[in-house]
Amino acid sequence: MGQKINPLGFRLGTTQNHHSFWFAQPKNYSEGLQEDKKIRNCIKNYIQKNRKKGSNRKIEADSSFEVITHNKKMDSGSSSEVITHIEIQKEIDTIHVIIHIGFPNLLKKKGAIEELEKDLQKEVNSVNQRLNIGIEKVKEPYRQPNILAEYIAFQLKNRVSFRKAMKKAIELTKKTDIKGVKVKIAGRLAGKEIARAECIKKGRLPLQTIRAKIDYCCYPIRTIYGVLGVKIWIFVDEE
């Protein structure tokens, strides 16, 4: 039988890079991993907390990032602060944190970085290490599976048909130069009693080719009918 494997871990070291760069003695290695997890969770919690505060006011975002409910267009800028990944580089006295984000409107606000640094400093074990936070905007947001998954989640929570949400997400990828995309949603779709999976694929998706650069994400969506699982594969290019 064929065995499924995570496309990112399968290509780590070839087309995928590590998101943490540091060295530690074997006895301190677990502490470093826990510190990285705390830093990433702290940043994600900060984004989520402040995103809820500003959900009632309009935030400038890409005009195509919208949800259609009851024949009205609803701006979804409040749900567009999606982090694609966080890089952590550790030196002797400095921790460099680079946040790769799709639409960094929230973090551009005055005092946002300083407030985030204070929260992160509490999570860092050593008081002698200083934090250096950098923000890097993703050039093509709809090329990232995390942003597409967040887009689908936002539409499903607003009672949009899951098929329409999947098709719209694939349409957004037409603006990029990707070679293939696959979207899969599993769970109690449309509130049905029996769970099932629906999948839409466009273009090529060579999962068994190691030199093929494939981005992937698995995203849970909590709805009134239960938890839905969204998986997105994007075939970027072949090296």
Curated annotation (Swiss-Prot):
Q: Name one Pfam family in it.
A: Ribosomal_S3_C
Biological processes, Gene Ontology terms: translation
Q: Which UniProt keywords apply?
A: Chloroplast, Plastid, Ribonucleoprotein, Ribosomal protein, RNA-binding, rRNA-binding
- One Gene Ontology MF term: structural constituent of ribosome
Q: Which SUPFAM superfamilies match?
A: Prokaryotic type KH domain (KH-domain type II) (SSF54814), Ribosomal protein S3 C-terminal domain (SSF54821)
Which compartments is it annotated to reside in? Answer: Plastid, Chloroplast
Read off the InterPro entries from this record. KH_dom-like_a/b, KH_sf_prok-type, Ribosomal_S3_C_sf, Ribosomal_uS3_bac-typ, Ribosomal_uS3_C, Ribosomal_uS3_CS
Sequence ranges assigned to domain KH type-2 in this UniProt record: 43-139
NCBIfam families (UniProt xref): rpsC_bact (TIGR01009)
Q: Which family does it belong to?
A: Belongs to the universal ribosomal protein uS3 family.
Official protein name in the record: Small ribosomal subunit protein uS3c
Species of origin: Oryza sativa subsp. japonica (Rice)
State the organism's lineage. Answer: Eukaryota, Viridiplantae, Streptophyta, Embryophyta, Tracheophyta
